[in-house]
Amino acid sequence: MSAILSADDLNDFISPGVACIKPVETLPPKDTKNQEDAYEVTTEDKVQPEDLPPAQISLTDCLACSGCVTSAEAVLISLQSHAEVLNTLDAHPEIPLTHEPHGVGVNNTEDSKEGKIFVASVSPQVRASLATTYGISEKEAGYMIDQLLSGPQGLRGGGKHGNGFTWVVDTNAMREAVLVLTADEVSDSLNSGESSAMSQSDDSLPKRPILSSACPGWICYAEKTHPFILPHLSRLKSPQALSGTFLKTVLSKSLGVHPSRIWHLAVMPCFDKKLEASREELTDMSWRQGDSSGSESQPVRDVDCVITARELLSLASSRGSSLRDLPLQPLHSSFNPPFPEKTLDSFLSLKRSRAEQSLATGTSGGYLHHVLMTFQARNPGSELVVNRGRNVDVVEYVLMSPEGQPILKAARYYGFRNIQNLVRKLKPARVSRLPGAKPAVRPAAGRRQPMSRNAVSTGSSGSDYAYVEVMACPGGCTNGGGQIRVEDARETLGPSQGESLDASMKPSPHEQRAWLARVDEAYFSMDSESESELETQSQLLSLADKEAKIHERLRSWSEYMNIPLSKLVYTTYRKVESDVGKDQTPANDTSRVVELAGKIGGGW
């Protein structure tokens, strides 16, 4: 083993950088009162301390700073946590709803003037984590979460107002829409008429290879360290973001309330999803048009707070509720009102069959798998060739025609170490400053690498991929940093569950792998009762029919809101630059102001 490796290197978490734009320590300020005594010596004991406000670091600051690649988990937990959920539930009364002939409406009372509507969205990876922890099915884990967030024995059993969440939706519904739109995006890119990624001129389409953008850790890494990657990122919102946009748009219009009075909680497997929720691109400013009336001028987030599966345990514990004692059955209709817009209610009921959520789809939503299945269905007789990489988190796929010609080439890269290899492949060649010199040819692999028998060929530069599914966590989203760990399960369940090992003992790598395998198994499993019903529906619809149905629902959403679909489903990315290490003198600041004033036609 190399001497530079240590146990600290055996994970993909990248610690925060030492240069932060929001330092928590401050130096004594310059004394501006006696500038004429430029050579006066002042000792440390004569410096008068000042009462400065405590430093505060917001997630927006983290996104605007390139000092860190990712953010410390402690910062993320302190800013969006189960405590914020409880504080918000106790700070605002719940807007009462009334059942009307056309659906659900707002009951105009004092609470409706000051209150909020609480909604939540839950990812399937979180349900799988809970299912593994409590030894139940993924479907029962969903019932457990519903009972906690909305039922009488959950959050509603305590607090100042006895509030709970009116609607709890599955992010799989919006994921189905994202999968269809992803295949459309790849098709449009391939049909753009250009064979080279570097020569694509349509700014509305990402450059090939299109890289998935649902992982916020990967997006944060690309924006801060490799801006040349940004043109390759898929423009689609993640299922979390799209769920927030859907809930805020439809509920605000159908119930006649401002988006700021709809509070959306997302329960996700990853701490970095908190960063995604804080992006300024994912607010109502991206889709709300012409609404300049009223005093609400601040952008309203589509997702107000994100907690993880592990924090869900803390949420229940803080309310004095035991998850294992909650009923594993659907909510009573009195705690589960119908969605106010009936035409769009079917959108939230989209589910996946076992065939669509299998080992081949992966644990991160199946973006790549859906693209491959779509193109294989469009090319009858084609064959999918799978080439394994140097580890289980790198896989290359080639769709071959019956004549043996490649139709589509795609890949999957999980984990930051593999992502760095992908980035090196896509890095543009260095341009020589000498006049007339040709660009340097970058080696495909970047460095000498031994080839194994089953390794993916590194002869390509990576630009011949049509699509790459990229996730920051090794193993995918079921291995997210916010998932319930072995030691968390031991502490939660206690010795009564038959754990022979001490709860304080650190689990071995073998135990951790076995635990993750159980989470994956729960993620891929479905209840047998619902399986038969869903499979009969699935067999009746071809892939093209399913896509047409989802497109129809997306059009209905756009028409109902009178907002172009592009404003609802697409987002943007930006290069993140900070002033760390740059000249911050007043003279430099003045020159920058003069330059800016000249550009906008101003000046003195």
Curated annotation (Swiss-Prot):
Keyword Metal-binding appears in the UniProt entry: yes
Gene3D superfamilies recorded: 3.40.50.1780, Fe-only Hydrogenase (Larger Subunit), Chain L, domain 3
UniProt keyword annotations, A-Z: 4Fe-4S, Iron, Iron-sulfur, Metal-binding
Family note: Belongs to the NARF family.
Chain positions covered by the region annotation Disordered: 434-461
Residues that coordinate or bind [4Fe-4S] cluster 2: C215, C270, C473, C477
Name of protein: Cytosolic Fe-S cluster assembly factor nar1
Entries under InterPro entries matching the protein: Cytosolic_Fe-S_CAF, Fe_hydrogenase, Fe_hydrogenase_lsu_C
Biased amino acid composition, Polar residues: 451-461
Residues binding [4Fe-4S] cluster 1, per UniProt: C20, C62, C65, C68
